[in-house]
């Protein structure tokens, strides 16, 4: 499905909020417009990470780099993080055209990463997480353009028994560790990119 595009369609989402988040950093705490239950825990706030993750339960203060997806070389999802959605975890950074935004009402809460650049490269990556009051959620994608970093899509609850890794693009010449199943193909040339990009 198409993105709601809080950046391009701001007039349709009055009161949308934008976050000036630095490289490998975490947004301020964002109030949800309804309580959201995720793996048995109910949350009323979330925080967006530049690298493409949505964290619940991190509080409102400064957070240690190791407690959110500040790591720019994602390894397979483990219990290092808890109550986290990984719509598109990779090494992303904002440029002058990039935006990280949120907007919500009683029917949905949207978190959007728009025109995010792959670190050290001129590219655009746009995707969203949408939460619903019935505690369901979805990931949506538009352009995706990554050639020098690994990519993870998934979610994690309270511990390692609640890890769901939908996709781990493990390119052999990137990242800090590589599995025996790593591939010598960049993300842009995969069927996963073809499937997700633009819908």
Which residues does each predicted region cover?
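Extracytoplasmic Ser/Thr/Pro-rich, glycosylation-prone low-complexity segments
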Residues: 1-199
């Amino acid at each position: 499905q198409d993105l709601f595009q809080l950046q391009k369609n701001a007039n349709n989402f009055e009161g949308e909020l934008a976050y000036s988040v630095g490289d490998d950093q975490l947004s301020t705490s964002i109030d949800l417009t309804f309580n959201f239950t995720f793996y048995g825990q109910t949350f009323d706030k979330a925080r967006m990470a530049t690298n493409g993750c949505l964290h619940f339960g991190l509080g409102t203060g400064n957070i240690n780099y190791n407690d959110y997806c500040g790591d720019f070389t994602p390894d397979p999802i483990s219990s290092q993080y808890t109550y986290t959605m990984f719509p598109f975890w990779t090494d992303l950074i904002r440029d002058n055209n990039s935006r990280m935004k949120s907007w919500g009402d009683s029917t949905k809460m949207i978190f959007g990463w728009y025109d995010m650049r792959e670190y050290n490269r001129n590219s655009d990556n746009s995707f969203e997480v949408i939460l619903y009051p019935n505690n369901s959620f979805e990931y949506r994608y538009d352009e995706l353009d990554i050639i020098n970093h690994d990519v993870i899509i998934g979610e994690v609850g309270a511990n390692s028994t609640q890890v769901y890794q939908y996709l781990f693009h493990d390119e052999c010449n990137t990242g800090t560790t590589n599995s025996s199943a790593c591939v010598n193909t960049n993300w842009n040339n995969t069927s996963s990119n073809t499937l997700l990009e633009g819908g």
